[in-house]
Amino acid sequence: MTEILGLPITRPVKVGIVVADFNDLVTTRLLAGAQQALRQAGIPEENILVVQVPGAMELPRVTRRLSETGVIDGVIALGAVVQGETDHYTYVCQQSAAGLAQASLTGPIPVMFGVLMTANMDQALNRAGGKGGNKGRECAQALLQVLSVEQQLSELR
């Protein structure tokens, strides 16, 4: 029986991180968590490309464009959408999630979804290094696991 596990990646990889500036109190912490996880996994700084965009609505397009450059192996999209008093929150959440899912499913490389969608700022901060962990860090770890699985799948040929 052949079993494919998310083992540590055995080849050098380059990672792109697309991070939204909006709610930067949260997104800077998500970014720091992702960068720390990548460094701890042995990814050198020069193999990490950070691209900043205005907000969550810009994440899908820039993530897709970055994935098509051929210079990176995977992308982490980071953002934070905090519910306000209008329906804007709902539309931003739906569209950014759908766009990133499309980029992941139809693009040439894996895309990790690291957009927090919370009812309030406390919930967002808790998931950006607080008691809820750091979702940026978790996305980086997940990306490395997916890259490992994809590497193993390509070796089945």
UniProtKB/Swiss-Prot annotation:
Active site positions, chain numbering: 88
Coiled coil: none
A Pfam family that the UniProt record links to this protein: DMRL_synthase
Metabolic or biological pathway: Cofactor biosynthesis; riboflavin biosynthesis; riboflavin from 2-hydroxy-3-oxobutyl phosphate and 5-amino-6-(D-ribitylamino)uracil: step 1/2
Keywords: Riboflavin biosynthesis, Transferase
GO CC terms, sorted: cytosol; riboflavin synthase complex
Binding-site list for (2S)-2-hydroxy-3-oxobutyl phosphate: 85-86, 127
Any single GO BP term: riboflavin biosynthetic process
Alphabetized SUPFAM superfamilies for the sequence: Lumazine synthase
UniProt: 5-amino-6-(D-ribitylamino)uracil binding residues: 22, 56-58, 80-82, 113
GO molecular function, one term: 6,7-dimethyl-8-ribityllumazine synthase activity
Catalytic activity: (2S)-2-hydroxy-3-oxobutyl phosphate + 5-amino-6-(D-ribitylamino)uracil = 6,7-dimethyl-8-(1-D-ribityl)lumazine + phosphate + 2 H2O + H(+)
EC number(s) recorded for this UniProt protein: 2.5.1.78
Keyword Transcription regulation: no
EC class (word): transferase
Family: Belongs to the DMRL synthase family.
Function: Catalyzes the formation of 6,7-dimethyl-8-ribityllumazine by condensation of 5-amino-6-(D-ribitylamino)uracil with 3,4-dihydroxy-2-butanone 4-phosphate. This is the penultimate step in the biosynthesis of riboflavin.
Protein name: 6,7-dimethyl-8-ribityllumazine synthase
Organism: Levilactobacillus brevis (strain ATCC 367 / BCRC 12310 / CIP 105137 / JCM 1170 / LMG 11437 / NCIMB 947 / NCTC 947)
Gene: ribH
